[in-house]
Structure formats: C-alpha cells, structure tokens
Amino acid sequence: MGLCLAQLAVTCLFLVPFVLSQVTEFVSIDCGCSSNYTDPRTGLGWVSDSEIIKQGKPVTLANTNWNSMQYRRRRDFPTDNKKYCYRLSTKERRRYIVRTTFLYGGLGSEEAYPKFQLYLDATKWATVTIQEVSRVYVEELIVRATSSYVDVCVCCAITGSPFMSTLELRPLNLSMYATDYEDNFFLKVAARVNFGAPNMDALRYPDDPYDRIWESDINKRPNYLVGVAPGTTRINTSKTINTLTREYPPMKVMQTAVVGTQGLISYRLNLEDFPANARAYAYFAEIEELGANETRKFKLVQPYFPDYSNAVVNIAENANGSYTLYEPSYMNVTLDFVLTFSFGKTKDSTQGPLLNAIEISKYLPISVKTDRSDVSVLDAIRSMSPDSDWASEGGDPCIPVLWSWVNCSSTSPPRVTKIALSRKNLRGEIPPGINYMEALTELWLDDNELTGTLPDMSKLVNLKIMHLENNQLSGSLPPYLAHLPNLQELSIENNSFKGKIPSALLKGKVLFKYNNNPELQNEAQRKHFWQILGISIAAVAILLLLVGGSLVLLCALRKTKRADKGDSTETKKKGLVAYSAVRGGHLLDEGVAYFISLPVLEEATDNFSKKVGRGSFGSVYYGRMKDGKEVAVKITADPSSHLNRQFVTEVALLSRIHHRNLVPLIGYCEEADRRILVYEYMHNGSLGDHLHGSSDYKPLDWLTRLQIAQDAAKGLEYLHTGCNPSIIHRDVKSSNILLDINMRAKVSDFGLSRQTEEDLTHVSSVAKGTVGYLDPEYYASQQLTEKSDVYSFGVVLFELLSGKKPVSAEDFGPELNIVHWARSLIRKGDVCGIIDPCIASNVKIESVWRVAEVANQCVEQRGHNRPRMQEVIVAIQDAIRIERGNENGLKSSSSSSSKAQSSRKTLLTSFLELESPDISRNSLAPAAR
C-alpha cells in the first residue's frame, strides 16, 4: 500500500505542471458580454465576444438570478440564409472538448422558441431545440483537431433566431478519449453522470482539471435518468482514490457511488439522437471497507448484449485493490434511444453492485470540408479586404450554406466553382494559389484595386469566364490564356497590360475584351492604318461600280432563293431537319432540336402500335429508327392552346439542356395537329416500375437504390444550378426517374417544368404535380421554388427506403401517406421500421440513417428549412461510401439493439454491422483501459 501511495505521489508531481498548463490554454467566451471578467466560483477568466465576431446583437436576460455570470446574456443572430461562426485556435492532432451552451431566458418576440442548426466546421453537430426557457442546454464534442483552428457555427433557423450563450474550448491530456475511429468520427457526449453525488450541482473545474461537466444523478430531468431499483443507497468516502488511468476521472466523482443493497442497480436513460454507435465507459472504485469474507462481484444485466453480460466485475481484483479506479470500456456499441442498464450481483457475492460514474458518447460522422487548397486561396482573398462584411463570413465556404460570393460543386470534398467579387474593394495581387483551384469555372474580380501581374493559372482547365476589367493590373498577358480549353469569356479592359496579345485570343473562339490598355499591342491593329488608306483609295472605284454591283447582287439573290427552295424540299423528303426550337413563333438561340417528319415516326413505331407508358405530356410509344437507334415517342393529339404552350416550352427547354442524368431529347414533330417529342429509349423502365410495378422485376438492392438516388439528385441539381435561368421540374416522382440499360437513372418528363427569372426566387402558378409528392407549402401558397422539387425528392427517398407507394391507406393506416408514416417512425428512433423487407437483411444501418435523415429534412413543412439538392447529393454519397465500406467506419460490437423499437422482427444482427478493420468479436467484452 505504501508503494502504491509513493507511485501515486510521483505521478502527481509530473501531472500537476501539465494540468496547470491546461488551464492557461482554456478558452472561455461569454457570448453577448461587453467586457472580460474572472468567474469568482472557478477562478477561470471569461472573455467578451465583442472583438471576436461582428455579426449578431447582444441580449441581456431579464432574469439575472443565475448563479453563473455567464448566463446573464446571450448573442442573437439574424434569421437569414447565412451561417454565423466563431473560430477557435487549436493545435493539429491534439484532442479538445468543444462545448456550447444555450440559455434562452424567455426574451424575444418570436411566436415559437428557437430551433436551429449547430455545426463544427462542415459537420452537423446538433439541432438545438429550446423547449424550456430557463434550462441551460449543453452540447459537447470531443474532437481531434485536423488544422490550426475549428469553426463553431449556428445557422438554418427553423423557428426563432439562432443564438449562443457560451463557447468553451478545453484541451485534453495525452491519449484521453482516443479511439480507433477519430479520423472519421467525433465523439458527441450524450451522458456523463456522477452517481452518489452529494447534491444536485454538476461537478466541473476546479474539481475536474479538464472541466468536464459531471451531472448529478439526483438532478433527474424528465426522461433523462429514471427507474432506480429498490434498495439503492448512496455512499461516499474522503479517502484518496487512485484515478490515474486513461481517462482521469476526477477524485470527487470517484469518492461517491451508489450501491444495490438488494442485489441490483437499475437505471433508464434517454439518449438524444440515438440509436447510434457509441463509446461507453463505466467507472468503479471500491470505497467501502470489506471484511475478510466479504466480496463484491456483479455483472451487467443486458439481454441484448450477451457478450457484455458474461463478464464479471470484481472491483478490488480488477483494480488491484480498494480505493483504486477500474474503468471497463465499451469502445463500439450500438445503443437505443432508451437505454436500460442494470448491474446484478453474482450468486457467490456477499455485497450488492456498486457504480461511481458513467460516460456515453455518440460516434458522430465527420463531414468532409471544402478542399484545403481552395480554402487557403479564399482566406488570402479575404485578407485583401479584411473589414468588409463579405470577408467576415465564417465557417466552411460550402457547407452547410454557401458564402455569399462563392459557388461550390457537389463532390466530396466540395470544390469552389465560382468566385464573384466584383466591386468589393480588393487591394493587392491575385493570390498565386489560385492556380490549384482546378474546379473553378468563373472568376469575377472586376472593378477593384488589384495590382501586379497575372499569376500562373494554367491549371484552371475548367475556367469558362474571367473578368478582370477596371483594375490596375500590369505586365504581359501570359501565353496560357490562349490555351485554357474551356475559356469562353475574358475581359481585361482598363488595366495597364503591355506587350503582344497571344494570337489565339484574337481568333474569335473567346469573347475577348481588352480596350484601354495603351501599351498592349495588337499586330492586326498595326496593319489597320494601311488597310484604311487602301480602302480610301479604292472608294472612288467602288462608287463607280456601285450600280453594276447592285444589279449583279440582285441576280445572285434570286438564284439563291430558288436554290434554297429546292434544298428545303429535298431535306423534308428525307424526314429530318435541324430547326431552332420555337417559342411563340420566334427562333431561340439557346439550342437546336431536330424536326422528324410524321411518316418517319410512323414507320419507326409501326404506326404507334407498341405503347410503353403515359406521362404528363401524353402517351409514350416504343420506336426504332432506320439507323437502329431505339427511341421513346411521346404524343398528344389534343390541339388546346395550353398543350401547345406546354409543347413549345418542353422543346425549348430540352433543346438546350444536356446532362448525363437527364433524359435527352432527340427530336420533335408538329404535323397534322399532333405534337410529338422523341427521346432516348430507357430500357429498364422507371424507378416506380421496379419499386411498385410488375413482379417480373428483381428487387433493387440497397446500393443500387442509392446509386439511382444519386443520379436523380444530380439531374435535379443541374436543373436548379446548372441552367440559367434555373429550372424547376415540379413533378418529381419515381415514375419520372427512368433507368437505362446499365441501371443508371435519368430524370424525365419536363412537360410541367418552369423556368425562374434571374431576379426572382419563385414562380407563381397554379399548383400542379402528383398527389403524394406535392409540396404542401407550394399547394398552399401557389409559390413554386426549387425547394418544391426537394420536397418531392424526399418522398422518392422514402420510397427507396421502404419500397412503399407515397399514398396508401393499406400501408399507412391513419397516417395515409408515406411522409407522415416515415417521420413518425424516425421521431421514435425506429428507422428499422421503414426499411423495405426485401433489403433489410443486407444493409448497413448507418447508411440507412444517413438517407432517412436527409429525406426527413427534405420534407420539412417550410421550404427554407429544406436542404439544397447539393446537400442532398453529399448525404447520399456519404451513404454510398458507408455501404461500400470505403470509409474507415465503425463495426457494431453488439447485436441489434432495435428489437424493442422495431416491429420488424426479421432484422438480423448483421443489419446493424458497420465495417471496420481490426475489431473482432473477442474485443467485445469490457476491457480495462
């Protein structure tokens, strides 16, 4: 015993300096406070956020009776489409506790209490939902920093205004809270409970040198910690406990405990955001003096975790003595929303079970941040006008909402595709790192005060538009400008460039504007003087020949008309003519559709004998052209002006839209009161056919469904962001998602599509669509937005998950539709109840949850709370990576814990397994760490 105490003393000598250094690295921000101060209860210094963040407004709470000085104010942020962020400095690869708190206090003019999103970098941390105005809501993450900073952001208000009360950063020691999965997962603290606590107060710094918050087991919030077994008593000691193990629980926590004097300890604990994979620790220390013939042995009583229940806990034996910590760990366990846990004594034990503390943390998947090279360039650009409002936008440039001056791709990681900083008071040189923004398609830096020469941008092979006019740029024009393969528009007017213009820029392939660069040389212009002189000399001769030339021209025009008439007759005989799409009798410049004569189509379709379906435009027939190309022919004989407008609209739209995930238009015909559209034939029918149609189709496996969802989402995302003006489909449904011969999905049926004007956010129109898919907000307001398509796509995602039709009294009973039914199950944490039985035995639960989560967001009642299609694509791609096992993800260490919640009893243990290397079933038993 003396040796142990000596070792403990020596260890403490080394630990104390480290703990003291920890405190100096604490970051404690009082949001809304106007000045710095020291908390007299803890001795910790708190700083005002007035110099940290420009946005938002401080609010002083009316009730100032709080013991903590930190909860007398809060900072409120606007309810717009921006995010508001605090940046905290970190050391790369070091672990930290990041903690935010929220006390509403009852002030505010909102009709509903606030509900909004909380993000750390690009990862959605939590949905903050205020239900009690006088309760402090705490959100805590354990992270390993991957850079020199982390961003904590609030955004996306559903009701009320986003706000924050405090923000804290606490560095951790050595390998505390290390996991095998920290490259891909944060730890979101779900519970940290001090059993046997002397009062209701939470225990934290200075009693815990790392300032963890240990909640008292006496302070039982509704549904938080209930169900104490009879005979549970509280014990404590003042003796020193050796707590120098991996997680360093505080001494005061280990000096108290609960004991089951009747042989059982039992609790029920609600875990928010569960079911999920979790990391759990139990802390035991024998703090009672046991007699020579007394023993304390017990087991975890948990029927769903037989591997854990087999292990016997003998604290004194496991910890090598009394008053010494034993901390068995459960590094990867799947837990339900409602966790019931019990410890029961073994038959050969004389004493009941004992418990000092527990910690449970959810594995929170880390979302990929925007490409680092892109972010570094954006940061450099922001430093060129640091006091501007646009430069103070924080967090990730692309996720969860875009900065106001960038556009991003939907890839993983996201890449910046557009920088729009016209007239933004930029000063200095263009950052050289811009050459590594390979996804950039548009660069707008005009009307600023840029100086210096153009940096190397030869790697910007996707660049289409570059505007640099009205700056103070100088030097020669680099040769690479003539060799950017996709460059369409380049403007360098009103600068100080000099030297020769690369000849390729003058050949007409690029819209090139370069006026008012006095020292810029154009060889063609140097020859211009002599050309003018020659023309002047020849002018007299031209005047003399004018009359004769006019006569010759008149004759030539007459011959041309006769030739054109003959050519037109000849090409119509062939049945295929290239026309510009027509709207209201006027030619459109944006694209070309092909006119196919009616006889040609009658021959191709065998007089329209093989009907393969019907869409909003009309009946669809199978055809084969003379060259062997298979086509789908959509036809209507209705001569109404409404359908005429619809026909013209669809031809005009599809003539200029080309994307791999949109069904391409091949041609059209308008003869004999028939309006016909000819599309590429899709061999595998529609998604609706496979989910709800003939039994001839083999059930789609989960990975195929995810791939189809991704394809369709990319098609819709292109309509929303890749077209100018953007296009709203407004009839998204599973029967309008067609599958080609390789089972790749393409979105079809643009008969109901609508274009939005560039300066509008919506289109007013009579609500049209399909029952079960129709956005309720659109139906009520008649205001069509891109979020109407997002709602309909959310319904499609629920179809993919469940295999059920959107509307079915048989399937959904009183819920009537798939949205109400699925959301009610998700609220209960029962995603298993949604899964199509055809695929239930062969899916990974985390991928299912990822899709269910984004589908649930898509069908939010209010459009501004729904994600953009770009965010939906990212979520689906996350699910695909999890399903394929390409992430260093988790593998569940337990049987399915959803049995108590799910009505589907056919789900197997493997349903909840997530792949991961180096974890075997032998590692499932509790292990001292």
From Swiss-Prot:
Modified sites of kind Phosphotyrosine: 679, 778
Annotated Gene3D superfamilies: Phosphorylase Kinase, domain 1 (3.30.200.20), Ribonuclease Inhibitor (3.80.10.10), Transferase(Phosphotransferase) domain 1 (1.10.510.10)
Glycosites: 36, 173, 236, 293, 320, 332, 407, 494
Modified residues (Phosphoserine): 735, 764
Cytoplasmic side: 553-929
Transmembrane segments: 532-552
Membrane-related topology note: Single-pass type I membrane protein
Positions annotated as LRR repeat: 413-437, 438-460, 461-484, 485-508
Annotated positions binding ATP: 612-620, 634
Gene Ontology cellular-component terms listed: membrane
Residues that bear Phosphothreonine: 770
Protein family per UniProt: Belongs to the protein kinase superfamily. Ser/Thr protein kinase family.
Protein name: Probable LRR receptor-like serine/threonine-protein kinase At1g67720
